[in-house]
Amino acid sequence: MKALWAVLLVTLLAGCLAEGEPEVTDQLEWQSSQPWEQALNRFWDYLRWVQTLSDQVQEELQSSQVTQELTVLMEDTMTEVKAYKKELEEQLGPVAEETRARLAKEVQAAQARLGADMEDLRNRLGQYRNEVHTMLGQSTEEIRARLSTHLRKMRKRLMRDAEDLQKRLAVYKAGAREGAERGVSALRERLGPLVEQGRQRTANLGAGAAQPLRDRAQAFGDRIRGRLEEVGNQARDRLEEVREHMEEVRSKMEEQTQQIRLQAEIFQARLKGWFEPIVEDMHRQWANLMEKIQASVATNPIISTPMPQENQ
């Protein structure tokens, strides 16, 4: 909280010094680190170009192009300021409601002054365009001189507004940072005793309940060990039964295989006994038939009959 009041005091002193000095430097005295500052610098550069009142500036002033460009730059700046303010509001955290309201009111006032002066500048440029249009064919030097003077004054006002807004936002940011740090400290203070109580309770429970837990773990381990041994014995017995059964099956299969082999040999011998006489008898009959054919051919040779010749 001391840091916040220190920033407020510096801001007030800076404001007093600013009121005592009518002249303002031509450049904004900060680094454009935030988007709203970058948008304001773009507006500032364009205004510096308008203030030259060159022939191109006067031509664009008469065509309303300058006021349109300024409108876009104004809207961009105000949009970025609102976005940055909203971001800081989300970071304020547990800051007192009174402090939050006061800081928000100060930033809102500075923001409103900057927006109003920007609007005044745009209206003055529109008024200049209307005055020039009503004086067609006449000298407009006096109008340009008045506009130049007004632009210098408006530039100083806008610069003061911008610097004041930047300082108010800096205070707002400091309040957000302090609120966050204070919130963390308060949370640490609230949770510290609870954490210590929990640690002490855990230590007490560990000291008092360690032995019962060990006894229960030992008993549980013994039960598990006994159950595992029982299951192992049952598995071994079952495996032995399966092995004996498989041995019995193998013996039966070998016996049946031997019986089938013997039966096949007997059947083969029977088939051989059945078919061998038949085959031998067929061989004899075939041999006799061949002998008869050969004898018949030898005794009755075939006489070749001459082929009839064709008429010549």
From Swiss-Prot:
Key word Transmembrane present: no
Region feature Lipid-binding and lipoprotein association, mapped onto this chain: 202-282
Residue numbers of Methionine sulfoxide PTMs: 135
Location(s) in or outside the cell: Secreted; Secreted, Extracellular space; Secreted, Extracellular space, Extracellular matrix; Extracellular vesicle
Sequence repeat feature ranges: 72-93, 94-115, 116-137, 138-159, 160-181, 182-203, 204-225, 226-247
One Gene Ontology molecular-function label: protein homodimerization activity
Signal peptide as annotated in the record: 1-18
Region (LDL and other lipoprotein receptors binding): 150-160
GO BP field: AMPA glutamate receptor clustering; amyloid precursor protein metabolic process; artery morphogenesis; cellular response to lipoprotein particle stimulus; cholesterol catabolic process; cholesterol efflux; cholesterol homeostasis; chylomicron remnant clearance
Modified residues (Phosphoserine): 139
Keywords, alphabetical: Chylomicron, Endosome, Extracellular matrix, Glycoprotein, HDL, Heparin-binding, Lipid transport, Lipid-binding, Oxidation, Phosphoprotein, Repeat, Secreted, Signal, Transport, VLDL
Top-rank lineage group of the source organism: Eukaryota
UniProt modification remark: APOE exists as multiple glycosylated and sialylated glycoforms within cells and in plasma. The extent of glycosylation and sialylation are tissue and context specific. Glycated in plasma VLDL.
Record region (8 X 22 AA approximate tandem repeats): 72-247
InterPro entries, A to Z: ApoA_E, Apolipoprotein_A1/A4/E
GO terms for cellular component: chylomicron remnant; endoplasmic reticulum; extracellular exosome; extracellular matrix; glutamatergic synapse; Golgi apparatus; high-density lipoprotein particle; intermediate-density lipoprotein particle
Region listing for Specificity for association with VLDL, in residue ranges: 270-282
Region called Homooligomerization, residue ranges: 258-312
Keyword Cell membrane: no
PANTHER family with a match to the protein in the record: APOLIPOPROTEIN, APOLIPOPROTEIN E
Family membership: Belongs to the apolipoprotein A1/A4/E family.
Purpose: APOE is an apolipoprotein, a protein associating with lipid particles, that mainly functions in lipoprotein-mediated lipid transport between organs via the plasma and interstitial fluids. APOE is a core component of plasma lipoproteins and is involved in their production, conversion and clearance. Apolipoproteins are amphipathic molecules that interact both with lipids of the lipoprotein particle core and the aqueous environment of the plasma.
Subunit structure: Homotetramer. May interact with ABCA1; functionally associated with ABCA1 in the biogenesis of HDLs. May interact with APP/A4 amyloid-beta peptide; the interaction is extremely stable in vitro but its physiological significance is unclear. May interact with MAPT. May interact with MAP2. In the cerebrospinal fluid, interacts with secreted SORL1. Interacts with PMEL; this allows the loading of PMEL luminal fragment on ILVs to induce fibril nucleation.
Listed name of the protein: Apolipoprotein E
Gene source species: Mus pahari
